[in-house]
Amino acid sequence: MSDIQLNTLKPAEGSKHAKRRVGRGIGSGLGKTAGRGHKGQKSRSGGFHKVGFEGGQMPLQRRLPKRGFTPLGQHLYAEVRLSELQLMEAEEIDVQALKAAGVVGQSVRYAKVIKSGELSRKVVLRGITATAGARAAIEAAGGSLA
């Protein structure tokens, strides 16, 4: 085993490079202009564009909209599954009953029943529409749409 001790540790030969000392005379090869060339914006101190600057073209972060939008009627309509009607205790169901049971949100005005799940009991829907498949399932269970 080699003679490695904490006080003799050093990096491998050639693995570390000395820091570039620019502007310290012509003998260094990086004197005078210090690797910046002659004149121009990039040769000046502080001479760099801001982040996102695209040369005067409208930058990406200003071309894109700040945020999307919410359709005004989005929360007025709700879909109700047959399986949700099955769990409700009331026989006559309207939008108010759906709100009271927590099936739809409080801002909902119109509801539509879709054929998803099973319905095995009689329900009467008032002021609620239904898809053709849901209507058939409700009527097959002895219910109706009023």
Swiss-Prot record:
Q: Which InterPro entries match?
A: Ribosomal_uL15, Ribosomal_uL15/eL18, Ribosomal_uL15/eL18_sf, Ribosomal_uL15_bac-type
Q: What does this protein do?
A: Binds to the 23S rRNA.
Subunit:
Part of the 50S ribosomal subunit.
| Record GO biological process | translation
Molecular function as annotated in GO: rRNA binding; structural constituent of ribosome
Q: What is this protein called?
A: Large ribosomal subunit protein uL15
Which of UniProt's keywords are assigned here?
Ribonucleoprotein, Ribosomal protein, RNA-binding, rRNA-binding
Q: Which gene encodes it?
A: rplO
Question: Gene3D superfamilies annotated for this entry?
Answer: 3.100.10.10
Q: Where is the composition biased (Gly residues)?
A: 24-34
Taxonomic classification:
Bacteria, Pseudomonadati, Pseudomonadota, Betaproteobacteria, Burkholderiales
The record's region (Disordered) falls at: 1-56
Q: What does the sequence similarity comment in the record state about its family?
A: Belongs to the universal ribosomal protein uL15 family.
- Write out the GO cellular component annotations: cytosolic large ribosomal subunit
